Regions:
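Mg2+-dependent phosphoryl-transfer enzymes with acidic/Ser/Thr/Gly-rich catalytic loops
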Residues: 3-8, 25, 197-275
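Asp-based phosphoryl-transfer active-site loop
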Residues: 5-21
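Active-site metal-binding loops of divalent metal-dependent hydrolases
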Residues: 13, 71, 226-228
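Residue-level signal for inorganic ion chemistry
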Residues: 15, 35, 70, 159, ...
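Active-site phosphate-binding/coordination module
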Residues: 23-132
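Hydrophobic packing residues within well-ordered alpha-helices of enzyme cores
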Residues: 28, 53-57, 171, 175, ...
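Short active-site oxyanion
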Residues: 38-43, 62-64, 158, 220-222, ...
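Conserved acidic, metal-coordinating active-site core of Asp-based
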Residues: 103, 108-225, 229-230
Length: 275
């Protein structure tokens, strides 16, 4: 492990910064507070849209700038401002759907989009739109059901395809070879049959690099924590990429260091080495 303390700490949220109960533990909150008071910068990098950040930020004594939607949105919660957004065009989303639709002709599936919106308070049904067969999660309390044509009519931070009968890894193996990288970046952040598409070349590393530049910090002075394939580029870009013990195998293999699980305060274990 590096002996020099990082200047920027970046953590994924689900499966990493939060414990399995969705909480920031007192131990983790304390060490992050010590790091910030010592002069380090801190940020969260998540697949979540920025409107889903408040339950996490409410557990912290400060409101860090966050990288959201897998790097497509950089958001300042203190002023409720989108600092940067990388959006998929309607044309690109249409091309993606044309490419992947034949792969799922015989299984139930649906599409959704996450639009950026002007604020974290923008009504959810204006930002989260789904097709009839999408089958939203229980926590998706508000959404608009639209046609595919309406879904992709305006730019979006993310396009998603859901197939409940498959794992995300199996879907990824089918989808990745047929999607032109010039149309979209392909990844996933959960195991339950959900694939996420973003602007070409945009991933968490993109958003984190924007944040690092904002603070005048170079990649070698960044430590990043993650657990799922949508964290891979961020971990590779950072001077030190740390995987949680509960991480996907591909993430464990790619990381510079493996810490304890999110149930065992793995992020705090590493940060306490410096702070």
């Amino acid at each position: 492990m590096n002996t020099t303390a990082p200047k920027l700490i970046i953590s994924d949220i689900d499966g990493t910064f939060l414990n399995p109960h969705g909480r920031v533990t007192p131990r983790l909150r304390d060490v992050v507070g010590r790091a910030v008071r010592s002069g380090a910068q801190f940020g969260l990098a998540t697949g979540r849209p920025h409107r889903w950040l408040l339950p996490v930020l409410d557990q912290l004594p400060f409101s860090p700038i966050c990288v959201c939607a897998n790097g497509a949105v950089v958001y300042e919660p203190g002023t409720d401002t989108v600092l940067r957004a990388f959006e998929l065009t309607p044309e690109a989303m249409g091309d993606v759907i044309v490419a992947v639709e034949p792969l799922f002709a015989d299984v139930a599936h649906g599409y959704s989009v996450e639009r950026v919106g002007s604020s974290a308070l923008t009504p959810e049904e204006e930002c989260f739109l789904v097709t009839r067969d999408y089958n939203p999660d229980a926590w998706d309390s508000a959404y608009a059901v639209v046609t595919v044509e309406e879904l992709i009519a305006v730019p979006a931070a993310k396009l998603l395809i859901r197939c409940p009968s498959m794992t995300s890894a199996d879907m990824f193996e089918l989808i990745a070879p047929v999607v032109d990288p010039a149309d979209a970046h392909v990844t996933y952040s959960m195991n339950e049959g959900l694939i996420e598409f973003s602007h070409p070349g945009v991933n968490k590393a993109t958003g984190v690099s924007v944040l690092a530049a904002h603070y005048g910090i170079e990649a070698r002075d960044v430590v990043a924590f993650g657990d799922m394939p949508n964290d891979l580029e961020m971990l590779a870009w950072s001077g030190m990429g740390v995987a949680m013990a509960n991480a996907a195998s591909v993430v464990l293999d790619a990381a510079d260091h493996v810490t304890a699980s999110n149930a065992e305060d793995g992020v705090a274990v590493v940060l306490e080495h410096w702070f």
